[in-house]
Amino acid sequence: WFYRCEALKQIEGLEYLNTSEVKDMSGMFSDCAALTSIDLKNFNTQNVTAMSSMFHHCAALTSINLKNFNTKNVTDMGGMFLNCAALTSLDLKNFNTKNVTDMSWMFYNCAALTSIDLKNFDTKNVTYMGRMFSGCAALTSLDLKNFNTKNVTDMSWMFSGCAALTTINSNTTWQCPESKDMFAGCTKLKGAVSYDKDKVDATMANPETGYFTAESTTVRSR
């Protein structure tokens, strides 16, 4: 629709778009590099199954209104906000992610994002989380206590480059596959132990001998 409208700074009249039958919104605003804000509160997304790369490389975007998004049928959110480097906040509290299988690269290089509330995220069906938060250089903490990772097969580089990240709160059932460079560049991260640049793989994804923080947990690496 608006793919690679690189000089586009604003969009008017989106409330008149009938999106009730749309199933695929992948790449819809991808590479709208000059767009600074977008209000999608009137979008009907009840039938959408794919939102991958929807806002990919919207590098100047500072705000997105997604409060009325119905995501109950969405299965693919991979790269959804990839390289939204100017976003400082993102309200996803209404997101229903129960059917999502791909969250890889979802917030990759959201370099100005200082916090994100994912407490309502249902991740029981997610299989891909590789690079999910990679490059989120301004994030200081992540609360992932509600994350169910039993079906995840790839967490490679999941938190890599999160240079300001000090705390990752995990739950008691976090399971982690063997994943390369999961914590690379997370130099301020501290859980049970402080960060060690030579220990950045999935073996450190636990709160007992690794970088996660939790009251009492048993975390398994498979």
Name these PLM-found stretches.
Residues 1-222:
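Negatively charged
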